[in-house]
């Protein structure tokens, strides 16, 4: 349990999946097994949504510390710093291609939502 939104944001910032995305994946999974009998147990990876492109991640902060964050969230840069969030921290994007293929999973919660939530931080 987190005492406030900013504590939760610091945890999410490191790489996490929002409960809404987990719930969506569970519903999609139940739908899948109700439609077909699987020959094997699936192990599927969930991840957050990202505004960053693969090219952004491959060339993270090529223009200086925090530059990739500023490219997408410049209006939140000072806010992020004020709450101890590191805009230079490169996210670890997990491979969810099998999850997308099997379930049609599309995560919706990203840093953009985290930073723009009403009353956030």
Residue ranges of predicted features:
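Short, low-complexity, polar/charged sequence segments that are solvent-exposed and flexible
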Residues: 9-10, 63-68, 113
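Residue-level detector of transmembrane insertion/anchoring sites
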Residues: 8-11, 87, 100
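C-terminal/domain-terminus segments
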Residues: 1, 7, 38-41, 45, ...
